Curated annotation (Swiss-Prot):
One Pfam short name: DUF525
Protein name: Protein ApaG
Disulfide bonds: none
InterPro entries, per the entry: ApaG_domain, ApaG_sf, Uncharacterised_ApaG
Gene Ontology terms describing biological process: error-free translesion synthesis
Coiled-coil residue windows: none
Gene: apaG
Organism (species): Pseudomonas putida (strain GB-1)
HAMAP family assigned: ApaG
Length: 126
């Protein structure tokens, strides 16, 4: 059972960006909006991100970086932080998953897992 002080939930909404994609050159662009919800009892700061982006051919790109879109937000208990970003993959379908490294106000570092989510061109999946 996880410690209720460090409870971060992540939800994702994705969108295919047809106008930024070029299927003839294997370029498929997607936007995603992520909400990081602090359901724990302590304030937590989002320090960094770690992504695994997998295309439909099974090729994996690993991305690490500080914060999200140039920010390292502090999220109070019961509050959330929402941001939008994007990814480009070389196939019509792919997935993203990963984690955020968090720093709680009591000094503990912990990971908030981001469950796999799908990037898919509309109509690419049956």
């Amino acid at each position: 059972m996880s410690d209720p002080r460090y409870q971060i939930d992540v939800s994702v909404v994705t969108r295919y960006l047809k106008e930024q994609s070029d299927p003839e050159n294997s370029r498929f662009a997607f936007a995603y909006t992520i909400t990081v919800q602090n359901n724990g009892s302590l304030k937590a700061k989002l320090l960094s991100r770690h992504w695994l982006i997998t295309n439909g051919d099974g090729e994996v790109e690993e991305v690490r970086g500080a914060g999200v879109v140039g920010q390292q937000p502090n999220i109070d208990p019961g509050q959330s932080h929402t941001y939008s970003s994007g990814a480009v993959i070389s196939t019509r379908v792919g997935t993203m998953q990963g984690s955020y490294q968090m720093f709680a106000e009591d000094g503990k570092r912990f990971d908030a897992e981001i469950a796999p989510f799908r990037l898919a061109v509309p109509g690419a999946l049956h």
